Amino acid sequence: MRAAAYSKAMRVLHVASEVFPFSRSGGLGDVLGALPAVQARLEQETEVTVLSPWYASLDGEPQELWRGELGGQETWLGELRQGGVRFLFLGLSAFQRPGLYHPDDVERFCAFGRAALPALDATGVTPDVLHGHDWQAGLVVAHAHLRGLRTVFSVHNLQYQGRWNLHEAAGWTGLPDWAFGPEGVEFFGDLNLMKAGLSFADHVTTVSPTYAQEITTPQYGEGLDGLLTRLTHQGRLSGILNGLDQDRWNPRTDPDIAAYGDPAGKAGAGADLRQEFGLDDAPVLAAVSRLADQKGMDLLLTALPELVRDWNVVVLGGGDPLLTSAFTGWAHHPRVAFAQGMNEPLAHRIYAGADAFAMPSRFEPCGLSQLIAMRYGTLPVVRETGGLVDTVPHEVGFRFAEATAQALTQASREAHAAYQDPAQWQARAALAMSLDFSWDGPAHKYLALYESLLGTAHPQT
């Protein structure tokens, strides 16, 4: 249910380290490229702005609005408008190098966090609600709270926290001395910018209801489970599922594939994928993923000798050098194809041409790949964790509980058995393609959260 409408047009400011299509390395950028635009469309009186760094590699040419000196360094702010959203880019010398992320990111995003609100002041931007995303925005959330602004902080992945020795880093933050205690930004002798966001936000969200529960436990809480449990008891932590950009990922209009609108139409995409990689007529089990421990890609690697009995296996990804080398070695097998790195047109062809999609994640805050796979009628084989629990119904996909190669193999066998029954497989695929994972629902929930905060007093930090 929507909260009572705020009495005047809301001004919402999202703050994040990346935003598609201007800067992107992963799912965070995808969220910031989609959610604000949907919010602006759903509530046309709401002013939606996104603030992110002005990287040297930024894909776009913002119009400079302001240039001055803040904290002893030259600072500038630029603007682009797209899809009803105002995108602001904060320029600092620390971000004038190739790429997005670097080993000194804690210091860089402290500079960003200190300069953000003063730079906005200089251009007359005063939000009603500031919505920070992940640790890179944690310090901005803390400074916004100290100004009395209403704040939301979204955890997209708790594993990455933005930590640095507190004695060295305290001077980078611009925070008052009292903020450096255990109830503030201190974490085992370190500055922790994720904890800054958690501690100072009026409300904290994660990107799925199950992940919101998981991170209150020692297994998934990354040392912050005590704080997150307290936030839960205070009613200040909730999970809101991410959505999917259904224009960007649409099998009916996708320019990278032979378009189709129902499961029967996948046959052409499947034939194209097998031909591209020189595979036989066995069904295709695919993975498009970072090659990382979190994603369970070592489990997929260990399971390969069993999987290739039933499946062609196609993997697209990069990351861990050892896993990359191992998958490269397996690519000589006639039923295994491996493409290193990330290639979006190829990813589209894989999502469309595969029959099943493996996500053996050890943890998965929300997950985007399973949403894309189902949109294309490709059935997920997933471990029961985080957003995979919330998004993959038993009637569609194949789920397993233990993070082992054996459990993945068994679930894949169940998927293969279902594939042998075309009527069952087509019914599952049709249901998958009918599921609504658009951003409209999540966008409404965030807008309702903002409205509720504007009608309440600040909680105690």
Q: In which residue ranges do the predicted regions lie?
A:
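Catalytic cores of nucleotide-sugar-dependent glycosyltransferases that transfer UDP/GDP/TDP-activated
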Residues: 2-461
